[in-house]
């Protein structure tokens, strides 16, 4: 554990005066002592004051607002008493699960609602008592506008990842949602970065908020950052070298576009490593399944876009690889924050090319950190978990177990910061099929790239093997499946015309 979560005042959860049932849920979930952000925010939230909290990724921000919300909710009142807004569907599912886990002894009903799911199901669920609603802004505004979700008596308005929710795309929706709440509501904002838009929102909609800033530096101390300078066509070869050398519990590989996500996932699968992929254009059910399986350790590697950069907490992830280098410091900060969760160690490796050199300089300047060139040897103690039992087991049907046993990273390099491997590099774009035959979605595994094709079906009895079509004419000799279609057709025509000739001869020679 590093100082980001251990540098506390020495308080215990019992010191906050929480309900006994809530304390039972907290301790059963594995919490021992509150983190710094929880020590600062829980007492202030319990007295009903607005909060503007800024803390690093992976330091316990979710529990910092869920615990006081659960404490203040009255289960006997069948009204929505807390609204938690998040920017992504996966984060909504994760936050709702935290609410259910911590409050399982309180008799509190938690509902999660996001876009991409049936509106009818949400309407039916809101007919029953719901105390906490977790969701994305657009869907909740839709429910409130249809007068299905009654927010007129909802005293708590919480925004996680507030910097994203107060961007240009979400701000109009947030402003409309606030009109459904009472004027004496309690507003709490939590995030790792606070742009100027957050200050404008707090001045307009918050009453003397209590400001918490635990960001003496932006990046987590437990995350070691390196970059490797490679050409674009050598990135996959470089990634293969990293997989074979690093001791990876679970890894997340980020790309800048959805097309590259799917193509890279296909390449990783061809290299023999278990791999899932996820991006915003996938069906919601498929995204949920991928997120659930990866979180449970079904697979070691996940390729994704910036969809999973915010709030996703998978503590088994110890390596983050930026296959495509991000364009700004905010995206970079949230990407590498997927490793090193809650005081654990993590490793961030960035594959950069000539066009990324200015972005690298700008990110180092904005974050006040230095990204080192990758050394020839990376010490395991910088990123390997101390407790091996917490490491999820990957699937083993794609590659023998030995391929996943990585040693210390010892990479021959001809120049500092350049990662080289043995053997000729493979072109990244050289395997695109000329005419892809898509697999039906209902029979396709979730991690199977959509351009994977079925093997060609063998010839069936009664089908000509050359043209894969039924032989239309009966023919003597072997079965139609054993002879060319043209041969069968020729024999059949000769017999036909022979028979017709005999009929015509009889007809002509017969007397009138």
From Swiss-Prot:
Q: E.C. number, please? A: 3.6.4.13
Going by the entry's taxonomy, the superkingdom of the source organism is recorded as Eukaryota
The residue numbers the entry assigns to motif Q motif are 11-39
Q: Where is the Helicase C-terminal domain?
A: 222-382
Q: Where is the Helicase ATP-binding domain?
A: 42-212
Query: What family, per the record?
Result: Belongs to the DEAD box helicase family. DDX6/DHH1 subfamily.
Domain comment, as recorded: The Q motif is unique to and characteristic of the DEAD box family of RNA helicases and controls ATP binding and hydrolysis.
> What is the recorded name of this protein?
ATP-dependent RNA helicase DHH1
């Amino acid at each position: 554990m590093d100082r980001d979560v251990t540098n506390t005042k020495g308080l215990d959860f019992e010191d906050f005066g929480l309900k006994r049932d809530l304390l039972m849920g907290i301790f059963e979930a594995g919490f021992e002592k509150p983190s710094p952000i929880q020590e600062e925010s829980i007492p202030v939230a319990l007295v009903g004051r607005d909060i503007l909290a800024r803390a690093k990724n992976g330091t316990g921000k979710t529990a910092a607002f869920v615990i006081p919300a659960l404490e203040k909710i009255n289960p006997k009142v069948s009204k929505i008493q807390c609204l938690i807004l998040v920017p992504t569907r996966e984060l909504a599912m994760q936050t709702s699960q935290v609410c259910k886990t911590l409050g399982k002894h309180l008799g509190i009903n938690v509902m999660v609602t996001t876009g991409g799911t049936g509106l009818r199901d949400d309407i039916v669920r809101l007919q029953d008592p719901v105390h906490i609603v977790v969701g994305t802004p657009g869907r909740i505004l839709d429910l409130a506008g249809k007068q299905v979700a009654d927010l007129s008596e909802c005293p708590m308005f919480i925004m996680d990842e507030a910097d994203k929710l107060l961007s240009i795309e979400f701000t109009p929706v947030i402003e409309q949602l606030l009109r459904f709440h009472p004027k004496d509501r309690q507003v709490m904002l939590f995030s790792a970065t606070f742009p100027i838009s957050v200050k404008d929102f707090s001045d307009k909609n918050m009453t003397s908020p209590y400001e918490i800033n635990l960001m003496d530096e932006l990046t987590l101390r437990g995350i070691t950052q390196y970059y490797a300078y490679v050409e674009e066509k050598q990135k996959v070869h470089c990634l293969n070298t990293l997989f074979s050398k690093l001791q990876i519990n679970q890894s997340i590989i980020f790309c800048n576009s959805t097309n590259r996500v799917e193509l890279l996932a296909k390449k990783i699968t061809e290299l023999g490593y278990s791999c899932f992929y996820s991006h915003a254009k996938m069906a919601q059910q498929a995204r949920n399944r991928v997120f659930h399986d990866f979180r449970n350790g079904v697979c070691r590697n996940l390729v994704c876009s910036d969809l999973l950069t915010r709030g996703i907490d998978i503590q088994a992830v110890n390596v983050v690889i930026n296959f495509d280098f991000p364009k700004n410091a905010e995206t970079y900060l949230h990407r590498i924050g997927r490793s090193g969760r809650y005081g654990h160690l993590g490793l961030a490796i960035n594959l950069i090319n000539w066009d990324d050199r200015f972005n690298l300089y700008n990110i180092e300047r904005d974050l006040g950190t230095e990204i080192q060139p990758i050394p020839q040897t990376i010490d395991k103690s910088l990123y390997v978990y101390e407790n091996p039992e917490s490491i999820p087991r990957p699937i083993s049907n794609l590659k023998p177990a030995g391929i996943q046993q990585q040693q210390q990273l010892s990479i021959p390099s001809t120049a500092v910061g350049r990662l080289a491997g043995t053997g000729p590099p493979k072109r990244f774009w050289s395997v695109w099929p000329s005419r892809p035959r898509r697999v039906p979605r209902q029979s396709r595994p979730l991690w199977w790239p959509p351009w994977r094709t079925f093997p060609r079906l063998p010839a069936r009895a009664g089908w000509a093997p050359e043209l894969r079509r039924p032989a239309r004419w009966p023919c003597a000799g072997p079965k139609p499946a054993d002879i060319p279609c043209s041969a069968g057709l020729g024999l059949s025509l000769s017999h036909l015309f022979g028979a017709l000739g005999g009929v015509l001869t009889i007809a002509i020679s017969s007397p009138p």
